[in-house]
């Protein structure tokens, strides 16, 4: 019999601690206009070629369920960080785009992510970081394959 495998639990726990640590670091940024959970959506938009995406694209990139994504995008819109626009070709499609304020928040997000990465990998060599991330990519691939 194989020994008990705790990878799923450990990854889940890392995710929780990662989010809490991100939020703690974000609180140190007086110009930050977003919370750690919202950074998932903002990061996806910051790295879109044209700075906007459909709800479907954002759901895939962030892993958020549609109902969660909808309420979070609405809050980001109220905060003046994103805009919502209907597609001219297909009225059922709506695009989420960054406002100027949303674009300006990118440098804060990158700074906090860098600081988080420094804490996350404290004591790891470059080789260990590459190896660890390689394992995570394999796990993601395995799970994607099993969900197709």
Which residues does each predicted region cover?
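Residues in the recognition helix of alpha-helical DNA-binding motifs
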Residues: 14, 72, 135
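N-terminal leader segment of winged-helix/HTH proteins
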Residues: 1-32
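Alpha-helical linker/hinge and terminal dimerization helices associated
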Residues: 14, 18, 25, 62, ...
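N-terminal helix-turn-helix DNA-binding core of bacterial DNA-binding proteins
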Residues: 21-68
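Short, hydrophobic-biased segments on the C-terminal half of alpha helices
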Residues: 55, 73-74
């Amino acid at each position: 019999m194989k020994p008990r495998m705790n990878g799923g639990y450990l990854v889940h726990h890392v995710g929780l601690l990662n989010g809490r640590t991100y939020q703690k670091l974000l609180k140190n940024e007086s110009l930050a206009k977003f919370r750690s959970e919202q950074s998932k959506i903002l990061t996806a938009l910051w790295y879109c070629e044209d700075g906007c995406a459909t709800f479907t694209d954002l759901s895939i990139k962030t892993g958020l369920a549609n109902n969660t994504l909808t309420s979070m995008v609405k809050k980001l819109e109220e905060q003046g960080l994103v805009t919502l626009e209907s597609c001219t070709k297909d009225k059922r499609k709506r695009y989420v785009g960054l406002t100027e304020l949303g674009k300006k928040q990118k440098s804060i997000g990158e700074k906090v992510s860098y600081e988080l990465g420094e804490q996350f990998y404290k004591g790891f060599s470059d080789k260990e970081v590459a190896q660890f991330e390689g394992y995570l990519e394999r796990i993601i691939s395995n799970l994607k394959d099993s969900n197709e």
